[in-house]
From Swiss-Prot:
Family according to the record: Belongs to the GDAP2 family.
Protein name as annotated: Ganglioside-induced differentiation-associated protein 2
Keywords of this entry: Phosphoprotein
Modified residues (Phosphoserine): S280
Pfam families with a match to the protein in the record: CRAL_TRIO_2, Macro
Domain Macro span(s) in chain numbering: 43-223
Recorded superkingdom: Eukaryota
Compositionally biased region (Basic and acidic residues): 253-263
Region of interest (Disordered), ranges: 251-273
The CRAL-TRIO domain, residue ranges: 333-481
Gene that this polypeptide is encoded by: GDAP2
Record organism: Bos taurus
Amino acid sequence: MDPLGAPSQFVDVDTLPSWGNSCEDQLNASEIAAETYQEETIRSPFLYNKDINGKVVLWKGDVALLNCTAIVNTSNESLTDKNPVSESIFMLAGPDLKEDLQKLRGCRTGEAKLTKGFNLAARFIIHTVGPKYKSRYRTAAESSLYSCYRNVLQLAKEQSMSSVGFCVINSAKRGYPLEDATHIALRTVRRFLEIHGETLEKVVFAVSELEEATYQKLLPLYFPRSLKEESRSLPCLPADIGNAEGEPVVPERQIRISEKPGAPEDNQEEEDEGLGVDLSFIGSHAFARMEGDIDKQRRLILQGQLSEAALQKQHQRNYNRWLCQARSEDLSDIASLKALYQTGVDNCGRTVMVVVGRNIPVTLIDMDKALLYFIHVMDHIAVKEYVLVYFHTLTSEYNHLDSDFLKKLYDVVDVKYKRNLKAVYFVHPTFRSKVSTWFFTTFSVSGLKDKIHHVDSLHQLFSAISPEQIDFPPFVLEYDARENGPYYTSYLPSPDL
């Protein structure tokens, strides 16, 4: 809170000049008359609209300082990104914001999630995750960035918000070209205001000094402040201006349907003349060959009539898709948790893999990415026999993997994972975890039931795995020594855990 009598650091959006008021070359009556003919013959798809321009504000400043209904925070999937926008928001909002984020279970790319503003002037914070940009996946990145802006605006509409302060969602860390991203941001907001303009009074683009020039350059294309500016901006519009809502359009993916499929066309004779071309190649391509009825295959699976070999082949194809994605995805944020790692071998010479439950913030990470990381690490391990050591030590409700995720993991992984897994050592279980494990292995994945071994102390674990063969997190050793007494004083924990 500001000291008594001191000026507030927050900025009321109603005091900021709108984009429409910043025009320096307003047209007089004679100029409008001179352009009437041009106006009637060719107009921009983004028409001059004084009312819409009055709702838009370009402001150079920190979005966290805006006094409006909601501001936008750009982050990563776990909502823990360290970028200037997020750090400023977290600093001003106070510690309660971090506690509130624990309940959100992260946020997928393109999604938008809502929290309170706490100590901010803004009543709410809308969190979203911009895409990582790679030129070969440009279309996917464009669609994801569009979804960010669209979902933020949709959430604002659903919550009856009167004003929203946007930061630049495409952070430099994610590599999205600023100008390309600005086109998507501006046209998405423009189209939303055209359709749902009555719900929002102000949309503020809060930009840095580096970003301001790009926004100044592109705003006239989507929010022309006069007929003259509209006309002048028309040649500068990109070829792809999206659909009626600003969403990127990929022509090759559009389904083309004849207006009157059953009616003869007026130029049928001209079309008939073109039928002399060689059509013999049609159907020769792989994609044009007849395949089995997919729906029929699914029915057969449900009825248990599809062969075991066909089921295995289908499962292998699915696993290979996950594996390809795991090898191409940036999983550094999951790796940094140090929740899964390879250590030594057990007394039978089998590879030991360690899972640290306390290092898995289930509510803050993208669990699909966690599954991808598991596949990325385990694919080459599972080709031979291995064992898993799971430390349940000092876990909280935010660390517990739900049964749906575990069942999905079990169903997705290749058969070699199940065949070569010889034991799962569940270290420091609680009564609740024992009951949950029994239900899960009895009713969901019965193939695991005989491989689960509950281990109450590390001393019991050492009968199967020598202590020198495991890298222990320090808190596991401290907890076990406190609960079960010291037993192996010469062992030192790994400094990396």
